[in-house]
Swiss-Prot record:
InterPro entries: ODAD4, TPR-like_helical_dom_sf, TPR_rpt
Record-level GO cellular component terms: 9+0 motile cilium; 9+2 motile cilium; axoneme; cytoplasm; extracellular region; outer dynein arm docking complex
Gene behind this protein: ODAD4
Biased composition (Acidic residues): 545-555
Any one of the GO BP annotations: mucociliary clearance
Source species: Homo sapiens (Human)
Protein name, as recorded: Outer dynein arm-docking complex subunit 4
Residue segments, region Disordered: 527-672
Record field: compositional bias (Basic and acidic residues): 527-544, 595-650, 658-672
Record-linked Pfam families: TPR_8 (PF13181)
Length: 672
């Protein structure tokens, strides 16, 4: 380092300070130290500049000069925090951890900054690593300790770690590469991977032609190699003081003992690991990281499958739970086939080991997969199997709602309404307003499909009230729109109802008119049947009068003729017995004169038909002309009935009359 006294300084103190800080940040610690020295030449004793140059010396490994500048910065102001911190850092690097801890505490009391707090922590750790913590030391009362004399204690107390000046500046009488003589085994343990670099640099020192070369800055290759070796030696010495080899061996033994103790407590540790893993899997899934949740679940499942039943007594239940977690993550990723397989494995394990809760969980998840892919009937079958396993009212509420929703998708509105009402009832028992809202909407939608618009409006209004309670604006808008549609449906139904009623009234009027016509028709037919009877009665009466007149005339003639007195008496007797004789001989006369009787009977029938057919035919013609367009078949039947009745009546009456006339004529002939 050049002497500023021999040179003429051409800049100012702030310029040299700024230059030194820039070079320090660039890693040019030697040049930065030179700039700070120039600044101190212009303004001697500046404490900030002394601290800055102390940092440069510390980075260069010149610990004594670093400590000297740090102490010089505290001469004018012992409470200067930057100086205290720099002195503590230098003492810590030198391996004097106890004094470094003292200055860290002193600075922390003056200004509780993060640098002092971190310094206290690392100094305490270094002390514990060097001498061990009280928990790792076991005092044993064995043997005779009288050989430990006061002198030996004083000698041991005077043995302090010396500064590493001899490492940085080796003596002239010995080679440079022998400046750091340490145990190779110790150095290998301390340096670790850097030990290979140290061996390489030492091999380069053996090449005499190489070490004689010079660099552009005037430095020799030998100086560069020695700088690297000294750096490694310095840090290995620091690491040995920070954590000596015996401390490393002690820690290794402590780790082995700890592992043995942990191995004995493995069941509890395993349970903690499992619970923590399941919480992480669930947290990843709920936070939206389905891929991370799936990877974590598969990793834990692979590890659990390697364990035996002794380590994890409920291994089967745990495996089923992990399959369920994997399936849920696969659902979120859209891997429905894989999710279905995972949940079916969970169901198989639950059935095999009789785990009701796991079975309920698996059926729930399988139903969700079926519903996601549109297989609503399979989802219904799966969820209906889960109904007996549902324990809480809230679980039943959700289950009934999902089943009803599937029935609604299948256009089975009655079933959807039934399950919706069950869900509504369970939600009211639970007091869950959110599920009351969902159930009311489901019931209303089913009633709309059933065209029960009034009930649908009532349920939509209930759902709207609950949506306002939970401040669900989207649900409110959807329900209002559905209410409008339901009200329009009511109007349409009312219009249809009025039309049907009018049509019904019209049809009833026509039916009553038709009945009146039928009654009128029946009256006409009765009149048709009654007219032949009246004609027959009138004809019988006229015949009786005629016979009476004839008898009176004959009786008068008999009285006028005295010669026929005897005949008149006999004729009177004959008349008195005429009815009995005619009645008694009617059978014999009919038998004897069959031919004559049949001819007379047929003649009488023809006469009656000609007489009685004429008015019935005219009536039939009139009625057929009036009603032929409406009821032709019924009119034909009635006309045939009307035709048959007078014919039968005529046959009966005219047969008897013909026989009576025949008998009377024969009696008169015999009497004459």
């Amino acid at each position: 380092m050049s002497d500023p006294e021999g040179e003429t300084l051409r800049s100012t103190f702030p310029s040299y300070m700024a230059e030194g800080e820039r070079l320090y940040l660039c890693g040019e610690f030697s040049k930065a130290a030179q700039s700070f020295s120039n600044a101190l030449y212009l303004q001697d004793g500046d404490k900030n500049c002394l601290v800055a140059r102390s940092k440069c010396f510390l980075k260069m490994g010149d610990l004594e000069r670093s400590l000297k500048d740090a102490e010089a910065s505290l001469q004018s102001d012992p409470a200067f925090c930057k100086g205290i911190l720099q002195k503590a850092e230098t003492l810590y690097t030198m391996g004097d951890f106890e004094f470094a801890l003292v200055f860290y505490h002193r600075g922390y009391k003056l200004r509780p900054d993060r640098e002092f707090r971190v310094g206290i922590q690392k100094a305490q750790e270094a002390i514990n690593n060097s001498v061990g913590s009280p928990s790792s030391i076991k005092l044993e009362n064995k043997g005779d300790l009288s050989f430990l004399s006061k002198q030996a204690e004083n000698i041991k107390a005077q043995q302090k770690p010396q500064p590493m000046k001899h490492l940085l500046h080796p003596t002239k009488g010995e080679p440079k590469w022998k400046a750091s003589l340490k145990s190779e085994k110790t150095v290998r343990q301390l340096l670790g991977e850097l030990y290979v670099d140290k061996e390489y640099l030492e091999k380069l020192l053996l090449d005499e032609d190489l070490i004689k070369g010079t660099m552009k800055g005037g430095l020799t290759v030998e100086d560069l190699i020695m700088t690297g070796i000294n750096y490694l030696d310095t840090h290995s010495n620091f690491w040995r003081q920070q954590k000596p080899i015996y401390a490393r061996e002690r820690d290794r033994k402590l780790m082995q003992e700890k592992w043995l103790r942990d191995h004995k407590r493995r069941p509890s540790q395993t349970a903690h690991y499992i619970l923590k893993s399941l919480e992480d899997i669930d947290m990843l899934l709920t936070s939206g990281s389905a891929e991370g949740s799936l990877q974590k679940a598969e990793k834990v499942l692979k590890k659990v499958l390697e364990w035996n039943k002794e380590e994890v007594p409920n291994k089967d239940e745990l495996v089923g739970n992990l399959y369920s977690c994997i399936g849920n993550a696969q659902i979120e990723l859209g891997q429905m086939e894989a999710a279905l397989q995972s949940h079916r494995k969970d169901l198989e394990i639950a059935k095999e080991y009789d785990l009701p809760d796991a079975k309920s969980r698996a059926l729930d998840n399988i139903g969700r997969v079926f519903a996601r892919v549109g297989k609503f009937q399979q989802a219904i079958d799966t969820w209906e199997e889960k109904i007996p396993l549902a324990k809480t009212t809230l679980e039943k509420t959700w289950l009934f709602h999902e089943i009803g929703r599937c029935y609604l998708e299948l256009d089975q509105a009655w079933q959807a309404q039934n399950y919706g009402e069950k869900s509504q009832q369970c939600a009211e028992e639970e007091g869950d307003i959110e599920w009351q809202l969902n159930a009311s909407v489901l019931v209303a939608q089913a009633q709309v499909k059933l065209r029960d618009f009034e009930s649908a409006v009532n349920n939509f209004e209930k759902a709207l009230e609950r949506a306002k309670l939970v401040h669900n604006n989207e649900a409110q808008q959807a329900i209002i729109s559905a209410l409008d549609d339901a009200n329009k449906g009511i109007i349409r139904e009312l219009r249809k109802t009025n039309y049907v009623e009018n049509l019904k009234e019209k049809s009833e009027g026509e039916a009553s008119l038709y009945e009146d016509r039928i009654i009128t028709r029946e009256k006409d037919m009765r009149r048709v049947r009654d007219e032949p009877e009246k004609v027959v009665k009138q004809w019988d009466h006229s015949e009786d009068e005629k016979e009476t007149d004839e008898d009176d005339e004959a009786f008068g003639e008999a009285l006028q003729s005295p010669a026929s007195g005897k005949q008149s008496v006999e004729a009177g007797k004959a008349r008195s017995d005429l009815g009995a004789v005619a009645k008694g001989l009617s059978g014999e006369l009919g038998t004897r004169s069959g031919e004559t009787g049949r001819k007379l009977l047929e003649a009488g029938r023809r006469e009656s038909r000609e007489i009685y057919r004429r008015p019935s035919g005219e009536l039939e013609q009139r009625l057929s002309g009036e009603f032929s367009r409406q009821e032709p078949e019924e009119l034909k039947k009635l006309s045939e009935v009307g035709r048959r009745e007078p014919e039968e009546l005529g046959k009966t009456q005219f047969g008897e009359i013909g026989e009576t006339k025949k008998t009377g004529n024969e009696m008169e002939k015999e009497y004459e």
